[in-house]
């Protein structure tokens, strides 16, 4: 396919690039700055956490993370598939799917039984990837309704089976 996926923990120089994408794509007034997001990406993990970057022909074009916390309204749920982003010029090539599968494989290898995510735009993508709708929630930071989704990971293959 012409792409590879690397962990930010193995390539810390990618943290500012990922931080800029995340702040641009998911930021909100009064939210984290690029510098704060970079520091968060480089901070020691809380449980099984990792951020991945997908390279297309050697160029970083997308990211996704396994995060301990994500949706403020649901601190009881953990961990989360978070920050799934692919640069617009590289969408439609299966990159988001590859990133989601990489995070799922990482989580499964860490014996995570269930993952959570929330989205306001990509429910069809996640539904195609066997995520199921778990309800509606309010994203308090952005003041919008979001779809809460979940995926049971028991029985998934190891990370090496997902082409990383």
Segments from the language model and where they lie:
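Conserved hydrophobic beta-strand within the GNAT/NAT acetyltransferase core sheet
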Residues: 84, 115-117
């Amino acid at each position: 396919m012409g792409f590879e996926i690397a962990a930010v923990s193995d390539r810390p120089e990618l943290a500012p690039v990922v931080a800029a994408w995340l702040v641009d794509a998911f930021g909100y007034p009064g939210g984290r700055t690029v510098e704060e997001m970079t520091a968060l990406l480089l901070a020691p993990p809380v449980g099984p956490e990792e951020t991945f970057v997908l390279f297309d022909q050697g160029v970083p074009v997308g990211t996704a993370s396994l995060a301990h916390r994500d949706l403020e309204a649901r601190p009881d749920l953990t961990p989360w598939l978070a920050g799934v982003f692919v640069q617009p010029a590289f969408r439609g090539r299966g990159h988001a799917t590859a990133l989601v599968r990489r995070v799922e494989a990482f989580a499964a290898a860490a014996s995570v039984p269930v993952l959570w995510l929330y989205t306001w735009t990509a429910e069809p993508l996640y539904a195609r990837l066997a995520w199921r709708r778990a309800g509606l929630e309010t994203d308090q930071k952005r003041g919008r309704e979001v779809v809460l989704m979940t995926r049971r990971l028991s029985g998934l293959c190891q990370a090496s089976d997902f082409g990383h």
